């Protein structure tokens, strides 16, 4: 199922159009289903539990021979790895710091991949969301950063993040785009009519 329908994506694109009529900023929005599949996490947890749990139990009780202990460790590894591959279990096992790091890394890659660093006056701005991580970030190029402090975007990010948690992704995008537009119209007002980047929502499945 799509994160946002075609109609909802059109609404986001139209909101970007309205903002860019009032500012030289080039606004790009990106919505990712997740920043990573975290396929390595089940193996890490299975390795730790498979190695330590049977060994610790056997150390205390001395029930198993060396061959039996190895078999118990292998069996534990397989069972834990299969259980941990369940998406909800995997999500629970991934530390918040890792989830945020992966989402932040993807946001920075998207800033480059969407050519936001190549605008003529350095006026690129990215509104990035990773749904699975409940992560929102606004990244700006130097032409905007020189006029608006990084802290300017924090309140918008906090509001949008809560909306993502509540499943209100479309409302979050529309509200954030509008709020960005109000600031950008004042600090990076329109001086030309050139549109350097496509006005659309980039969806990463």
Per-region residue spans from a language model:
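Membrane-cytosol interface motif
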Residues: 96-114
């Amino acid at each position: 199922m799509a994160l946002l329908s075609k109609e909802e994506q059109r609404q986001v694109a139209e909101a970007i159009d309205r903002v860019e009529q009032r500012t030289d900023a080039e606004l790009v929005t990106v919505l990712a289903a997740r920043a990573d599949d975290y396929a390595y996490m089940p193996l890490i947890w299975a390795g730790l539990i498979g190695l330590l749990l049977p060994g610790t139990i056997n150390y205390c009780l001395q029930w198993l021979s060396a061959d039996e202990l190895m078999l118990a460790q292998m069996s534990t590894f397989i069972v834990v790895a299969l259980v941990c591959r369940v998406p909800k279990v995997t999500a629970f096992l991934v530390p918040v710091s890792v989830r945020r790091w992966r989402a932040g890394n993807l946001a920075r890659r998207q800033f480059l991949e969407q050519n936001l660093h190549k605008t003529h006056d350095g006026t690129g701005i990215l509104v990035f969301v990773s749904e699975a991580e409940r992560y929102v970030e606004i990244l700006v190029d130097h032409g905007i950063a020189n006029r608006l402090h990084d802290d300017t975007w924090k309140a918008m990010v906090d509001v949008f993040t809560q909306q993502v948690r509540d499943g209100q992704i479309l409302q979050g995008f529309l509200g954030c785009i509008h709020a960005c537009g109000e600031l950008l119209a004042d600090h990076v007002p329109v001086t030309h009519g050139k549109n350097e980047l496509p006005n659309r929502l980039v969806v990463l499945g």
